[in-house]
Amino acid sequence: MRIKRLDITGFKSFMERSVFTFDEGVTGIVGPNGCGKSNVVDAIRWVMGEQSAKNLRGRGMEDVIFNGSENKPPLSMAEVSLTFIVDDTDQLAPQYQGFSEVTVTRRLFRNGDSEYLINKTLCRLLDITELFLGTGVGTKAYSIIEQGRVGLIVSSKPEDRRHLLEEAAGVTKYKARRKAAERKMEATDANLLRVTDITNELEKRLDALSRQAKKAEKYKKLKARMRDIDLHAATHRQLELMAEKKMLQSRLENLGSEERESLDRVKELEETITRRRTELEAETAALQALAAEVHTLESSLQRDTQEMTYGKRDLEETRARVAAAQVELDGLLARKAEMSEAMAAREAELSGIAGSWKEDEVAMQVAQEELRRVSQLQTEVALRLEQERAGLVAVATRLANHESNLVNLARQRGDLGARRAKLQGELETLRAQEQTLENVRGDVAKRVEDTRHLAAELAERKGQEEDALTRTRAAFTENEIEVIALREELSDKRSRLSTLEDIQKNYDGFDRGVRAVMTRAGVQAREQGIFGLVADVINVTPRYERAVEAALGERLQHVIVESRDKGVELVDYLKGHAEGRGSFLPVPALDTLPAPLEPDFSQPGVLAHALREVTCEEALTPLVQLLLGDVVIVQDVATARAWTESGGPACTLVTVEGEVFRPDGTIVGGESEGAAVGALQKKREIAELATEVARVEERYNEILTRHYTLQKQMGHAEGVLKGLAKNQHAEELNLASQEKDLHKAGEDLARVRERVRALEVEEGQLTQSHQALEHEEEASRGEVAHGQADREGREERVKQLVSEQESLRLRAETANGELTGLRIKVAAGSERGESARKELDSLVSQRQDMETRITRLQATVVEGGARVEELARRTTDTEGGLSQRAEEHRLAAEGLEARRAAHTTASAEVREQDATFRELRGRVDELMQGLSQISLREREIALELEHLAAGIRERHQVELANELHKYHMLAALAPETEAELKDLRAQVEKMGEINLTAIDEHAELSKRYDFLTAQKKDLQSSIEQLKEAIQRIDATSRERFKQTFDVVNEKFQAIFPRLFGGGRASLILTNEGPGGEPGVEIVAQPPGKKLQSVNLLSGGEKALTAVGLIFGIFLIKPTPFCLLDEVDAPLDEGNVGRYNDMVKEMSKQSQFILITHNKRTMEVSNTLYGVTMEEPGISKLVSVRMREAGAANDDKVTAA
């Protein structure tokens, strides 16, 4: 396997598509520094799967996309394709064997999306990595050696150097398999841990479910016994409540009569009491009015007495307050005179301080004015200085700009001249490319049209197949709906049929004796002389089922036997086994029966003779005639009454609704109960359901067959459609690729044409620009001279302003010192004046307070004297009216006592009547309470009966009334049975929550546990197998590495003297490193030196040693190709010659691609590619075959 071709588009500096074709032997890539030669190496590494942007000399992977230049915009995609020629000796993956060429492609879009392709088919990065495993080719293999990596080989750690020999030994694919096995083993360990956790959990659940299942079985037995006791107790309690209810109704009538009599007497006495109470209330009102009058007089007397006492006390207190106020007033007037003298002294002191302070303040204002003038001058000088300095900076900046502009203008004129010369050559090249691209675009356009036609045909066929598949899916959906509907219908009917058959088979609802006899007889009933129940052997017209059921009644569950003796035998059986009761009908002889009745159907409402509407087997015809020979079916009750009243023949009349009129006058009607109800209907329903089930099953099978047919058709159609979609996708990809090529060809052509036009315009612009530059250069020289003169003048003015600013600073410091001294003196005088003013203000405030107090005391003395005179007058008036009110109070109190005695007598009479009324009313209340208690008890009984029935219905899903007949003849529960029920309830409650599904869950969980246990064993076995596989891989890897190491060491020892012209070198295995594997150390002894570690050699010696190691590896495991990037750079002329000899020798086995600057290395190349950068930032490719060009072109190639 060798490289045939390398296609680069939009990768790094290769904006346009560049194609490198590599033949056998040696291919050289040359060019000046920075032209993009190493980008070729990066492109090969990148397309082979390199994922590190750092290894590609970038910060991020998007850096590999062409990022634009001065004249070219950035591209949106980078694409590199590497084509290999494959021969029979190459060991590739099975899917790539048989190909003569393999093309690996990688694309990266600026939005971050990427694609990997092998032979134009999308694949994974892993597929590309596996393609090169064990071949020595790869991003980290020894087939690609850059200049930096040469030094890295000799300076890296022994453990890292080991990777080269592992690649040569083919160990990398084993390590990849080992890592895959380890990952698989980790996943298996995780699965085993998960399965173990699940099985452990299942073991716990199994133990719990086992206990729950046993508990559930015990629970069912307890509940069955509790149900029987519960029903027995409930039925007897219902009978007791019903008896109590009847007794209460009798008592209710007796108490009602007595209550009515007592109520009449209560009403009469109540009227008398009401009249007497009205009279007493009037007397009470008069008594209260008189009492209120007495109370008013008494209160007035007490108030006057108290008022006189308070007046005297207030008079004394007022006199005392007036005397005290007069004393205080005299003292305040004396203090006021003293305070006026102190205020006059403080005012004199304050006047002296104010005169001195004003003189100091005037001096301070003069100093402040001086300081303000100096500060204003400083500000003006500083502003002018700043302006001059800013102008000086601006002048200097302009001067520097003009001087720089002169230098730039000179350089630009030189660049313009070189550019004009280059444009002429580029225009000629572009015109030739334009014609070539025109031809390419025509060829691609034809291929695109052909592919579009094929894609359209595939799309049309795919549309037809999709339509057919849509129709098939619609039919399948409709059929699926019908299948589901029929399945549900069939399930419902089967369930109903099974239920009815189970009821019929188990004789559910029939008497216990009937069930016992029929169950005992089983399927051999006929052999035992038992024909079955009456309901089982007859078939009735559906219209008259209800009428015949009503006519037969309980006889429907009579057992038909062959003889009377058989009937007696069965009765004995029931008695002997305590299996309840049963009725048995022997089949009579036909000649012993009377002739059947012939009804008159001409009468209105007479519908049918029951005997004619019933069929049975011939042997049982006499029995049916016996049962129904005299039964006539009529329309309704009115028809039956008309038959009887008209004197019709004696017979049993039955209406279609089930009312029965018997010859003896008995009339039967209402809702039927018991086992016979609906027996004939159930029997007919069973037959109809069986027929319906058969019909639905037949239809279901037909639909199901069609379902499978449509499913197969749909699967086939989906397969065809999938194939078409795959073909269409392939053609679409092909079309997209071709359209991309067409678009690219168009873009290339447009770009070339646009470039030609741009270059022509640019050539004209260059001439104009050259003339403009000359004029601009002359103007810049004048500006420089003017700027220099301006700068000198401004520098002189700045010096003068700085001197003036310093003088003003000293003057300001002096003025500021004087001002500070004056401010201190003024502040001291101000402080003394403030203290004196505060004392004066305090005296003024005290005098004002004192004057206010004097005014208030003078008012108090005047008002107090007036108050004393008023109080003395009021006390005299109060003493005169007090004796008159005392006499009025005495007379009113005597009248009140007489009125109270009369009121007491009347109240006693009313109380006696009230006692009689309460006694009679109490009796009425007792009667009403008794009636209420009886009514309440009746309601309680009704509620208890309802609750009892609801409880039985809820607990056992049966109606208590239907169970009454089973228990009412039995004795009440014995005390020990009640105790047993309590014990059963206690056991059930003690059992706690019961999982009734535990048995089924236990079985299902056991099954799952067994399955997971088997899975666990399989996982454990798988882990052991993986461990063995890893051990085998390790053993094989160690063996192959050791063999390769020995051979490479031998070759290295032979090559080293050839490269150095003598000396010796070898490889040594070091102790095992952190990974448990030994490293590889290099020791070398160049000619004339001691044996030493390779790290101690010079740069050139290190490079040559590394080359020797690589060539040693090549001798035992040559790779399909080898790419050496400036490996010869550190070598001198002699070493380069020996290096080239080795390359020529090994190029017979492998393909060599050399990137070099060395002319001697170029000479050994069969083909040279020159990489140039005629336009900044864009690499361009030229090539020469050395054997065709000859030595005469050597200088030209080197220049490229």
UniProtKB/Swiss-Prot annotation:
Q: Where is this region: Disordered?
A: 763-795
Sequence positions that bind ATP = 32-39
What job does this protein perform? A conditionally essential component of the chromosome segregation machinery. Required for chromosome condensation and partitioning. Important for positioning of ParB-parS complexes (ori of replication) and of the ter replication site, as well as for segration of the ParB-parS complex and thus chromosome segregation. May act via the formation of a condensin-like complex containing Smc, ScpA and ScpB that pulls DNA away from mid-cell into both cell halves.
Query: What InterPro entries does UniProt report for this protein, alphabetically?
Result: P-loop_NTPase, RecF/RecN/SMC_N, SMC, SMC_hinge, SMC_hinge_sf, SMC_prok
Per UniProt, what is the name of the gene that codes for the protein in this document?
smc
Q: What does the entry's domain section say?
A: Contains large globular domains required for ATP hydrolysis at each terminus and a third globular domain forming a flexible hinge near the middle of the molecule. These domains are separated by coiled-coil structures.
Keyword set, alphabetical order: ATP-binding, Chromosome partition, Coiled coil, Cytoplasm, DNA-binding, Nucleotide-binding
**Protein's recorded name:** Chromosome partition protein Smc
**PANTHER family the record matches:** STRUCTURAL MAINTENANCE OF CHROMOSOMES PROTEIN 3
Where does this protein come from, organism-wise?
Myxococcus xanthus (strain DK1622)
The record places domain SMC hinge at 528-644
Give GO MF terms, alphabetically: ATP binding; ATP hydrolysis activity; DNA binding
